Each structure stands twice: as C-alpha cells, then as structure tokens.
Design a protein with these regions (language model features):
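Acetyl-CoA-dependent GNAT
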Residues: 5, 10-91, 102-104, 108, ...
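Residues forming the Rossmann-fold NAD(P)(H) cofactor-binding site
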Residues: 99
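Short glycine-rich hinge loops at helix-strand junctions in the catalytic core
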Residues: 96, 113, 136
Length: 158
C-alpha cells in the first residue's frame, strides 16, 4: 500500500474534521473493548490548537482511497520526538498501517536530530502496548494523567 502523509494546517477545517472523526471512531471502538480513555472524544478545537503547536499528520491510503489514520508529533525539551493521538480506523487494523506510520515517525525523528521516540500509552491497552513492544519500544516508567495511569515507552534510534 502507498500512503500519503499530510501535515495538517490549522486553517484546514476539512482535514481537522477527518481527524476528529477518526479519533471519535477509534474512541468508540476502544470503549467496546472496555477501554474508555478516549471517551469523550477529542474536540475539533483541540485538534486545531494542536495543529498550531505540533506536527499533526493525516494519513491517506492511495490504494483504498481513504483516510486511514492520524497521529501527532513534536520534539520535546529533551530533544526527543514525542508522539501522541496515534489512531488507525478499526476497519484498517492489521494491515501494516501502524508499522508504516511508525517508520514515518522514525524518519521524521532522524531528520530532526532526535535520538529517541517517546510515547505514553494507557496502561490497560494491552494490544497497543504489545504493538509498541513488537516495534522496539520499551517501558521506562509510569505516570498518572488526570483520569488514568499511563505507561511511558521509548524507542532509541540507531
């Protein structure tokens, strides 16, 4: 499959709406599995604000001619790439999209001089934790957010 990685501009309301729908669908899908950390949905206003301060990516699959996933990235104060709001629509899970998105993130990190990619994952999201482990991420700690506990993971880039 060939993906197009679109960096979303804060004035691109159409793309922001697509991201909102992807995050909402993923949140509902997680809730069906007993994982409620993405309910309520992330707002359009919050996504727009993120587009001003982070690299917000919308992924279009050229083969199926649909938007399949989204994620956000920024270089944190330690000089590492921090990724968040990583979501692939449920109907596209298991097709390698997540792995290809991680490779895009790794390339972006290297281009920006980062030595690590960092992320936080809901501690009960066993599927996501296993996915990140499979792709070379290791747990380095835990933290408490406002509503739940998160596992801090990182991947060192060679």
């Amino acid at each position: 499959m060939a993906e197009e990685y679109i960096i979303v501009n804060p004035s691109d309301d159409k793309s922001i709406d697509v991201i909102f729908r992807i995050l909402r669908k993923c949140g509902y899908n997680l809730a069906k599995k007993g994982l409620f950390h993405w309910i309520p949905s992330y707002s359009r206003r919050a996504i727009k604000k993120d587009c001003e301060t982070k690299t917000v990516v919308l992924v279009h699959d050229d083969e199926v001619k649909e938007y399949t996933s989204t994620f956000q990235m920024y270089v944190n104060k330690e000089g590492n790439l921090y990724v968040r709001k990583i979501a692939t629509l449920p109907q596209f899970e298991g097709r390698g999209i997540g792995g290809r998105n991680l490779r895009f993130m790794e390339d972006f990190a290297r281009q920006n001089g980062c030595k690590k990619i960092c992320l936080d994952v809901y501690i009960r999201s066993k599927g996501a934790i296993g996915f990140y482990r499979h792709h070379g991420f290791v747990e380095i700690g835990e933290k408490r957010s406002i509503r739940f506990k998160e596992l801090i993971m990182e991947k060192r880039l060679i």
